[in-house]
Amino acid sequence: MAQKSKKEHIIRTALTLFLEHGFKGTSVDLVVKISGVSKPTVYNHFPDKAALMHSVIKTWVENNQPTISLIKDSLALTAIIEDQWLTSEALSLYALVIGEGRRFPDAKHFFWHSFDANWQKAFTNAVDNSALPVGLTVEALLDQYLITRLKKI
């Protein structure tokens, strides 16, 4: 396995573990066990668990940037939200970032400004250029979506 792919494999494994067990519940030993690499390999790429957590968030955000063109109607909007933005994995990462934000302020800042803010901008641009009613804001659409989703719980 090439160096870069080992690092990516460790990050993918750690993402799954952090989302499932949180930061405190995920040890480097568990990452080693599940990823099938040695402890020195993990530490060659990441000096500590905090650096691994930051790399996980950074890599995930870089791989999940918005790709929205035109929103034709509210059904298209809902599909984009569910399929691209607020996926179950994204919601789990939001929870992780919120829960660990004090411990990792740089990662939290990066997440909000590089993921959430980019989605907000992309939606604003898409809504502004769509056939949706004039004056309808992204915030109103998202509120409507979240209320509908919460009612299903």
Annotate each language-model stretch with its function.
Residues 1-5:
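N-terminal intrinsically disordered/low-complexity leader segments
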Residues 9, 13-51, 55:
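Helix-turn-helix
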Residues 49, 53, 78, 91-94, ...:
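A general structural signal for well-ordered alpha-helical segments in protein cores
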Residues 49, 56, 60, 89, ...:
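Hydrophobic/aromatic residues within well-ordered alpha-helical segments
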Residues 54-85:
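Amphipathic alpha-helical linker/stalk segments
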Residues 74-109, 150:
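Helical hydrophobic small-molecule/effector-binding pocket
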Residues 83, 99, 121-153:
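Amphipathic C-terminal alpha-helical segment
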Residues 85-92, 105-132:
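Amphipathic alpha-helical packing segments from all-alpha helical-bundle domains
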